[in-house]
Amino acid sequence: MLKTIHEKARHHTRPLWAWLKLLWQRIDEDNMTTLAGNLAYVSLLSLVPLVAVVFALFAAFPMFSDVSIQLRHFIFANFLPATGDVIQQYIEQFVANSNKMTAVGACGLIVTALLLMYSIDSALNAIWRSKRVRPKIYSFAVYWMILTLGPLLAGASLAISSYLLSLRWASDLNTVIDNVLRIFPLLLSWISFWLLYSIVPTIRVPNRDAIVGAFVAALLFEAGKKGFALYITMFPSYQLIYGVLAVIPILFVWVYWTWCIVLLGAEITVTLGEYRKLKQAAEQEEDDEP
């Protein structure tokens, strides 16, 4: 009986081990860590223009004035762990200065933000090894839609959650609402990664693969926030060495780590589909053998 159980265990772990080997092979071939470093560099250059464009969109809609403040706190609290207050002050100063720019400068900000979208598009399609190229107009429309509708949808979701909390008739549901809001960052990350892995690649991505890859990326992202904040708190070596400038390497390391998670989720999504195809091909060869 023990021998049978051992054989069944080996039978179930063998596909998992083969999939992990395939995942590691793809990560190595795609130079994932180098690609994450490139995206981190582009992201840091595009961070202020991107935030400036997003907040300018909220300024154009007075109904989102209160939500804009909530969204700022939500972004800096959930996407920039540790030293988020310092980074928030610097970025808001940069954004305030960008409001004094001319129309040409504003167009430059928009172009810089769109270049970040293009870099993300190129990186993900390189992982999917897609040779299909979208028309330029279509790509611009997709980038602009993400740049405009993304923040507005996030603001609308925050407005709805605030409205639910303000309802007196929902006092009996406060515990349920609190639990939902507690996992809201995880759900938002999961949905965001799922949309990223589903929409950006120029080839069809199986929905279940995108869901699994997005869920793993969301879990790693939330765990990474907690772990990174704990590391900064327990081992403040950056602050001892760099002093006031410690926020710069901390921000860079966090952005780099974030892109490693995003690309790892993409690699997982791709590998799930690729492993399934390889397994089907192997089974087909076995069936064709006499």
Swiss-Prot record:
PANTHER family attached to this UniProt entry: INNER MEMBRANE PROTEIN YHJD (PTHR30213), UPF0761 MEMBRANE PROTEIN YIHY (PTHR30213:SF0)
A Pfam entry, by short name: Virul_fac_BrkB
Any one annotated GO CC term: plasma membrane
UniProt name for this protein: UPF0761 membrane protein YihY
TM helices/strands, residue ranges: 44-64, 104-124, 140-160, 183-203, 210-230, 244-264
Family as reported in the entry's similarity comment: Belongs to the UPF0761 family.
Topology relative to the membrane: Multi-pass membrane protein
Keyword Cell membrane attributed: yes
Localization annotation: Cell inner membrane
Coiled-coil zones: none
Keywords on record: Cell inner membrane, Cell membrane, Membrane, Transmembrane, Transmembrane helix
InterPro entries (alphabetical): UPF0761_bac, Virul_fac_BrkB
Cell membrane as UniProt keyword: yes
